[in-house]
Amino acid sequence: VSAMCLEALRSFGKIAVEAVAGHSLGEYTALYAAGSLSFRDAVKLVNLRGKFMQNAVPLGEGTMAAILGLDRNIVNDICIKASSKGTVEAANINSPGQIVISGKVAGVAEASGLCKEAGAKRVIELQVSAPFHSSLMKPAADSLAEELNKITIKDASIPVVSNVTADYVTSAGTIKELLIRQMTSPVLWEDSIMKMSNDGFDTFIEVGPGKVLTGLIKKINPKLKIYNVADAATLGDFLGSWHPGQPAEAAR
């Protein structure tokens, strides 16, 4: 869906996209936008990736929780302490004060309790089928690596900001390596947006259903201009306010 929204946007020929980024699964759309993955390969990889993650940990053994209102260093320290009960790690650094943890049910439960004691505003257990972006996804990462060897990954035509490093990447070889590492690494979304903001990017377009990333970006830097293109109505709104040739960063 995100790729189709992107193509609808491109068909008007008004946008000079200078970099792209995607959150977790959305990184595949970003790589498609940058010409690194074909649409066919991106869809294939996304489908296989989901299956590999489901098979990595038996259903019911892993979970995730959102921690609101605590500094990331505190959350990381708590995860280390709670890991005595079971694997638990930071999985998504989404925005200031919004961190998702992932791991074994007992480890996440222990960390959630400690986060509440440390003053977290809210701790929300997420309804997920697996502990994504944790070391428990190593079997899934290994399976994905095998599939990546079967497809063609091209150098990106524009910089892609990696979830793993929060830095620009264009090399096909590095992109492949980072897609594998992404399975077991935290999504550094806050760091990615700050990197681009510090480098002068001031306009972002969220492409695809929903406004989750728009909300996160506003929390990271309220001064940034953010647009959302999710359907015909929002596409029309965007085209009515956009200035041709204006540089942008596409997020999904």
Feature-to-residue mapping (PLM):
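FabD-like malonyl-/acyl-CoA
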Residues: 1-75, 126, 203-233
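Alpha-helical and His/Cys-centered functional microenvironments
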Residues: 27, 137, 250
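Acyltransferase/transacylase module recognition
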Residues: 1-17, 149-252
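Alpha/beta catalytic cores of group-transfer enzymes, especially the acyltransferase/condensing modules
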Residues: 33-186
